[in-house]
Regions:
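PAS-family sensory domains
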Residues: 2-9, 23-25, 30-100, 130-142
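Residue-level signal for short segments within beta-strands and strand-turn junctions
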Residues: 38-39, 112, 141
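Short, intrinsically disordered/low-complexity patches at protein termini
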Residues: 60, 68-69, 128-130, 141-142
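A short local loop/turn or secondary-structure capping micro-motif enriched for an aromatic residue
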Residues: 53-55, 126-129
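Short, charged amphipathic alpha-helical "coupling" segments at sensory-output junctions
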Residues: 2-23
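Per-ARNT-Sim (PAS) sensory domains and their PAS-associated C-terminal
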Residues: 6, 83-102, 106-123, 127, ...
Length: 142
């Protein structure tokens, strides 16, 4: 006779969202430039210094815009400093931590109000249950 076991638990999607909510208040209150992305790469929370550094408007957290969907103007390291192609933009540390589930560190360039800035970014994936719930990134101006 077959044997069936049933186990009920919170779905990974719910536990992933709970993980992001757990980090939301500390990120928003942080004096450090930090950014919290959800599992889809959308901006979940930002600190005031992060918004200033990346040129993000107040209230960006409520819109849940994707980081590479025009929220931040990422530029290349070339002399012309053109817009970073999407395939390259998806390799920046906050998204790399989401995609690999591992720590990611690297330099990136952003343009805010026409002023290019080079930033050092270190990102860690956040886990909710068995899934990657998001990533937490800290920035430092180079």
């Amino acid at each position: 006779m077959p044997h069936i076991e049933l186990s009920l638990s919170v779905g990974d999607g719910e536990s992933a969202m709970a993980t992001c909510r757990q980090w939301e208040a500390p990120v928003r209150a942080s004096a450090d430039a930090c950014l919290l992305l959800d599992a889809s790469g959308a901006i979940f929370a930002t600190s005031p210094s992060c918004r200033a550094m990346l040129g993000l408007p107040d209230g960006i957290d409520e819109h849940r815009r994707g980081l590479v969907d025009g929220a931040v103007r990422l530029i290349s390291f070339s002399a012309g400093g053109g817009v970073l192609p999407r395939w390259d933009a998806e390799r920046i540390p906050p998204l790399q931590a989401l995609n690999t589930g591992a720590l990611a560190r690297g330099l990136l360039r952003v343009s805010s109000s026409g002023v290019p800035r080079t930033l050092d970014a270190i990102s860690t994936p956040l886990h909710g249950g068995t899934e990657i719930a998001g990533s937490l990134t800290f920035f430092r101006r180079c």
